Design a protein with these regions (language model features):
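Conserved, single-site charged/polar hotspot
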Residues: 176
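Short beta-strand elements
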Residues: 126-130, 173, 182-190
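N-terminal beta-alpha lobe that positions the nucleotide/phosphoryl donor
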Residues: 1-170, 179
């Protein structure tokens, strides 16, 4: 678990966390937060016997209903992963942000292949907004599981990428915004 301001390694924190770190270190107004690293993702999966690069290659090689079934099984297994030790680290990081106990949180994907020059993955991974403190662990697992959706694998196939992506997760306090938005200069999927 790293503070957003210390997120500099793409392979460890993903594209979104790097972008947020750049904003924070350049003194733009962005909520402070932290990143649950790809290392935490990999260690948590491996501790449960889930070897992501092997499972990815299996799913990547399949198609149709066979792929859908394999991916569904992966998502179920990820949802059952034991994360109590990681949750304790997250709680410490949350307390370090000095937010009131009733704060709601944004739990956001930051995959290693997300928000890059040649790949967007816009809208393919999940985001959870207004998450209560004790629901962050479930949101984390759901974001990890969103790597294992058919639409993600299909996009990877179209990009000719055979490598299993890894997911970091950004956690930030929700803010009262007057407006928000995203602008695309090219189509986010094709």
């Amino acid at each position: 678990v790293l503070p957003l301001s210390q997120c500099t390694d793409l392979n460890l924190v993903g594209g979104k966390a790097i972008g947020l770190a750049r904003l924070i270190t350049a003194d733009f107004s962005a909520p402070q937060g932290f990143c649950i690293t790809t290392e935490a993702y990999t260690q948590s999966l491996h501790a449960s016997g889930f070897i992501e690069h092997e499972e990815w290659q299996k799913a990547y090689a399949l198609s149709g209903n066979e792929r859908a079934s394999a991916l569904a099984d992966c998502r179920i297994r990820i949802g059952r992963i034991e994360t109590s030790q990681l949750a304790a680290h997250c709680l410490t990081a949350l307390q370090g942000l000095h937010q009131p106990p009733n704060t709601r949180w944004a739990v956001r994907s930051s995959a290693t292949n997300e928000d890059m020059a040649h790949t967007s993955f816009a809208g393919l991974y999940r985001t959870h907004l207004c998450v209560a403190l004790f629901d962050i662990d479930a949101a984390l697992k759901d974001l990890w599981a969103s790597l294992w959706e058919e639409r993600v694998v299909s996009y990877q196939v179209r990009q000719s990428s055979h490598t299993a992506p890894r997911m970091a997760v950004v956690v930030q306090p929700m803010i009262e915004a007057q407006s928000a938005g995203v602008a695309y200069s090219i189509h986010p999927v094709t």
